[in-house]
């Protein structure tokens, strides 16, 4: 297998595995776990795996004092993005939620335009309008589909939080930190938030030995949409660069919709199909359009990736 083919395959695997989030999260809800318990264990299992990966790559664990506050801010943004995304699954079909979440590159482009005075092309403006039309269709998706205003607001909150996370990382000194190290500390901050919430509320759902199948879902939620997605993303960027990898991120919502329909009996109406196509095409055009694609170096919802700005190759693994 040549390098380019390998890169495209890995990018597709990365996006598809991230799209498995609902596949493993929804059974945990059905088994009695609340979203904070799900995220508590997901973060808790991911942190040591990242630490091992960091050690294998012979990276140090030290941080400077000036990095502490940015890491706390990023940890809060990341935790908020996770909370709102996983909350949305309680109020709408997971496939629709994952598709609306996919608009975060457009939100990043708007943030860069409004706050950093970066030019926004007519093509990007047209894509934004098309994406909004797609979202309107998804929110009025027809008989049988589960969509609520509360769910849509949660997804928008998740997309906005993650967009702010991306911009903060790329516009601050913290962006120079090794990717895995940064992610590990960000998740550590998030885990502290979830642990504090559990202590204050006195509520943390821990599956019993009889509920072994829930532990399998927790581990799968950690391994597939997180660790495998991270590894495949870093390798894909090395092989084909950041923009093609970002474009293949289109498989994230497609995978979520596929499992939603196949496993959870979510409804697929003509409006949903048209809405999906409009959102996916508009976002793909924005990502392929230059600087926004370069800015979205940290692609995965769980584990972003850093790329050398000059070469387009993965850096500081």
Q: Predicted segment positions?
A:
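Helix-loop interface residues and adjacent transmembrane-helix termini in multi-pass membrane transporters
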Residues: 31-32, 91, 117-119, 175-176, ...
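Membrane-interface helix-cap regions at the ends of transmembrane helices
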Residues: 24, 46-64, 132-146, 189-214, ...
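Specific alpha-helical transmembrane segments that line the substrate/conduction pathway
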Residues: 37-48, 78, 86-119, 124, ...
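Hydrophobic transmembrane alpha-helices of multi-pass small-molecule transport proteins
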Residues: 50, 72, 111, 120-140, ...
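C-terminal-most transmembrane helix of multi-pass membrane proteins
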Residues: 39, 43, 140-141, 214, ...
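Glycine-/small-residue-enriched transmembrane alpha-helix faces in small-molecule transporters
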Residues: 1-37, 41, 80, 84, ...
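Hydrophobic alpha-helical transmembrane segments of multi-pass membrane transport proteins
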Residues: 13-20, 24, 53, 72-91, ...
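Hydrophobic alpha-helical transmembrane segments of multi-pass integral membrane proteins
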Residues: 5-10, 36-52, 127-130, 150-157, ...
């Amino acid at each position: 297998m040549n390098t380019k083919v390998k890169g495209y395959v890995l990018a597709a695997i990365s996006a598809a595995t991230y799209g498995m989030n609902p596949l493993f999260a929804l059974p945990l809800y059905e088994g009695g776990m609340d979203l904070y318990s799900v995220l508590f264990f997901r973060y808790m299992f991911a942190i040591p795996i990242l630490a091992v990966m960091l050690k294998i790559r012979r990276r140090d664990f030290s941080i400077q004092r000036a990095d502490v506050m940015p890491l706390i801010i990023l940890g809060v943004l990341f935790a908020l993005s996770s909370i709102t995304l996983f909350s949305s699954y309680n109020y709408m079909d997971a496939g629709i939620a994952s598709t609306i979440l996919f608009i975060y590159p457009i939100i990043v482009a708007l943030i860069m335009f409004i706050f950093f005075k970066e030019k926004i092309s007519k093509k990007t403006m047209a894509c934004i309008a098309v994406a909004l039309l797609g979202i309107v269709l998804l929110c009025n998706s027809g008989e049988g589909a589960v969509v609520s205003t509360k769910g849509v607001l949660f997804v928008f909150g998740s997309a906005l939080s993650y967009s702010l996370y991306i911009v903060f990382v790329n516009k601050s000194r913290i962006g120079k930190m090794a990717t895995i190290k940064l992610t590990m500390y960000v998740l550590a901050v998030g885990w502290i938030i979830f642990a504090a919430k559990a202590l204050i509320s006195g509520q943390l759902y821990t599956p019993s030995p009889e509920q072994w199948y829930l532990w399998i879902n927790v581990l799968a939620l950690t391994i597939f949409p997180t660790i495998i997605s991270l590894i495949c993303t870093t390798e894909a960027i090395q092989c084909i660069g950041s923009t093609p990898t970002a474009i293949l991120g289109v498989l994230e919502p497609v995978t979520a919709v596929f499992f939603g329909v196949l496993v959870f009996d979510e409804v697929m109406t003509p409006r949903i199909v048209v809405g999906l196509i409009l959102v996916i095409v508009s976002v793909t055009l924005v990502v392929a359009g230059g600087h926004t694609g370069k800015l979205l170096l940290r692609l995965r919802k769980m584990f972003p990736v850093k790329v050398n700005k000059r070469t387009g190759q993965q850096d500081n693994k």
